[in-house]
Amino acid sequence: MPISLIERNGLRLRLVLENYPLEFVNSIRRASILYVPVMAVDEVYFIENNSPLYDEILAHRLALVPFVSDEALEHYRPPEECAECKENCDGCYNRVYLDVEAKDQPLMIYSRDLKSEDQMITPVSGAIPIVLLGSKQKISLEARLRLGYGKEHIKYSPVSVSIVRYYPKVTVLGNCEKAVEVCPEGVFAMENNKLVVKNELSCILCEECLKYCAGSVSIESVENKFILEIESVGSLKPERILIEASKSLLRKLSELKSKLEAGK
């Protein structure tokens, strides 16, 4: 059951999985969205806010700022222990603070203005705009972050893209220049006045080329061969997301096994 790497580019990871059931590959995809914990703002306490945004809108924006979470997975308690925590919450929360006032000119507040107690948990990017303050306007707040799962809220999902595609097989049977023009993914090219396949893996099986070049091009998917693509928001490296998603599946299978054995 080979797994091959076809792209590792910063926040993006693409793998080819061969001879795996679609259900298994799709389970990894879903787990990467729903069951890999990352840090995000859970609660916001406003001390002062006379900005153009209501407290609720500003809190929502802060919650969607992704935070680096690699170290958090090692040093903070899991979501199961902290989601409903009211007392004895040590190891659950990190705090960030925002205390900014515009003077005589409008001032844009960015994610880099958030000051974190834990220097290992900071915004993925400091250039995320939060709110534009007018002259003499001020925001002062404290926000609490905890680990959470994407199944709770999308702010806790570590991925912006997690998809499974069928592995394409593209065959040129004739010469049809129109295929180069109509293919949205640039799969084809003309070389020496002949139609050739330039980038087979980019094919999304839309069959747009077949509308104009039926008989000249063959498009099909390879059985039990899939492309898994994961794109991180930056909280975790895509490799870590894949590992944690696989661990979550193993835990769920182990839990299912235990319950089945207990019911015998």
From Swiss-Prot:
Transmembrane segment boundaries: none
Gene3D superfamilies, alphabetized: 3.30.70.20, DNA-directed RNA polymerase, insert domain (2.170.120.12), RNA polymerase, RBP11-like subunit (3.30.1360.10)
Annotated keywords: 3Fe-4S, Cytoplasm, DNA-directed RNA polymerase, Iron, Iron-sulfur, Metal-binding, Nucleotidyltransferase, Transcription, Transferase, Zinc
GO CC aspect terms: cytoplasm; DNA-directed RNA polymerase complex
InterPro entries: DNA-dir_RNA_pol_30-40kDasu_CS, DNA-dir_RNA_pol_insert, DNA-dir_RNA_pol_RpoA/D/Rpb3, RBP11-like, RNAP_Rpo3/Rpb3/RPAC1, RNApol_insert_sf, Rpo3/RPB3_RNA_Pol_subunit
GO molecular-function term, one example from the UniProt record: 3 iron, 4 sulfur cluster binding
Protein name: DNA-directed RNA polymerase subunit Rpo3
Organism: Sulfolobus acidocaldarius (strain ATCC 33909 / DSM 639 / JCM 8929 / NBRC 15157 / NCIMB 11770)
